């Protein structure tokens, strides 16, 4: 089978890495497109995935997103036409599902946050199948035109599938000036450029200021953009480390005592790896986060002083799942 995969954000590289490997092992031909956004290209190179770069992120404004979407879809259509794809796969890329539909290619999209309304109104309606975690109530997807048999659901977190074969490498942290006696906290900045996260996260700067002045803490901050990196460095907080280059984030999480994240992927990676994690997300919580909070695997944070800054003992209950199940659900034919 000839399959097209479109990757539009760094996390999508991690999701599709084991799936692409499984497809190639069974003899399928895979071609990948990607857009330039954050560390997407770096991660593709790190994992040895060749991709055709088409388009870039549209920035904060809706007008910018609309313009880059039109340009990118034109580029995708021009690239894909005549390649005779039998299936197209994406993680939330409405660019792919819309383009695939216009070319008559069956497509599947997957996501784990149901309130990215505009994105899902476009992407879900164009897709042949929509694959989501069981934690998302099906009725929340009906407004996007998603019902069985179009709807396919999987147990657990997507991170439990793509991290199934992951073993953390302590050597990945050698470039960081870490003191093993201090509490290691991994901190992820808010997704301020995301369309569904329109308001700034007021809690996050308070958390950063609190951690950055704790003498028994080392907070490794992983910014999403150069602008965020410059902002954090300018604060000159004594207990904050901002890596000069991209780091193995999954290994960093695995060896951390605590994770504090304003996004979603890193929260769920920590939960999958059994690491205590707090969310400072300022938007509406989705079904996955709601389930993790009920299970005690994710803690909502409203006051930085509530952080339990202690050394961790043990793996906290890591969960692994077979990525072949995810692949079976995604394949639209």
Model-derived segments and spans:
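Conserved nucleotide-sugar phosphate-binding/catalytic loop shared by glycosyltransferases and other
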Residues: 24-68
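Catalytic donor nucleotide-activated moiety binding site of glycosyltransferases and closely related
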Residues: 47-60, 208-243
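Donor nucleotide-activated moiety binding/catalytic core segment of transferases
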Residues: 72-79, 226-262, 266
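A donor-sugar binding/catalytic signature common to diverse glycosyltransferases
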Residues: 88-99, 109-110, 252-289
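A conserved, positively charged/aromatic
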Residues: 108-110, 117-132, 253
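A nucleotide-sugar donor-handling region in carbohydrate enzymes
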Residues: 128-200
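Catalytic binding pocket for nucleotide-activated donors in carbohydrate/polymer assembly enzymes
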Residues: 272-316
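C-terminal amphipathic helix plus adjacent low-complexity
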Residues: 314-333
